Amino acid sequence: MLRTIFLLSLLFALSNASVQDFCVANLKRAETPAGYPCIRPIHVKATDFVFSGLGTPGNTTNIINAAVTPAFAAQFPGLNGLGLSTARLDLAPKGVIPMHTHPGASEVLFVLTGSITAGFVSSANAVYVQTLKPGQVMVFPQGLLHFQINAGKSSASAVVTFNSANPGLQILDFALFANSLPTELVVGTTFLDATTVKKLKGVLGGTG
């Protein structure tokens, strides 16, 4: 009996792509917590398993001088159900991917061009920082605050891969200053003065 229960629990934990060979996303249907519904295998094409978008640099003309080009199931249907996602990072000079977390996934960063200083902070507040060159890889454990900064004078780029179809994203600065949390509460919980908080809210579009 216990063996049967164990086997059933494993089956329920499997994704569609584990039960089947693959589950190419049907983008005409709504996404669910388990991903997109599968299109029928007879309609699957080789191009469903190919994504070309990571070969084009993103637009870095913005406040962080950086761009993220995602390759999730919505852009790359062949990834659906595989528990993977990927993206391209482009960092102009002085570009930064601010402190952020991915609650649902660990991340691997592979530097393509330029020089990138990257790091993360552990739950014990230990800091791990490294300047990476092309061909080097760094891993960021699930849920930990981490960042990437262009460490050179020219543009830099990288590819990141996640062990989840939905890694989630929360940017620390946006969480604090790009919402309607009252200034006095931000002051009380961050030890910043009200002038600084209001300035940051103004820059990031927050209110309160």
UniProtKB/Swiss-Prot annotation:
Subcellular localization, as worded in the UniProt entry: Secreted, Extracellular space, Apoplast
Residue ranges of domain Cupin type-1 in the record: 52-198
GO cellular component, one term: extracellular matrix
Paired cysteines (S-S): C23-C38
SMART domains, alphabetized: Cupin_1 (SM00835)
Residues of this chain annotated as glycosylated in UniProt: N59
A single GO molecular function term of this UniProt record: manganese ion binding
CDD domains reported for this sequence: cupin_OxOx (cd02241)
Domain of life assignment: Eukaryota
Entry keywords, A to Z: Apoplast, Disulfide bond, Glycoprotein, Manganese, Metal-binding, Secreted, Signal
Tissues where the protein occurs: Expressed during germination, and also in green shoots, etiolated seedlings and whole seedlings.
Signal peptide: 1-18
Positions annotated to bind Mn(2+): H100, H102, E107, H146
UniProt main location, coarse: secreted
InterPro entries reported in the protein's UniProt record: Cupin_1, Germin, Germin_Mn-BS, RmlC-like_jellyroll, RmlC_Cupin_sf
Record function comment: May play a role in plant defense. Probably has no oxalate oxidase activity even if the active site is conserved.
Additional record remark: Is the most highly expressed of the GLP genes.
Subunit-structure text: May not form oligomer.
Name this protein carries in UniProt: Germin-like protein subfamily 3 member 1
Organism: Arabidopsis thaliana
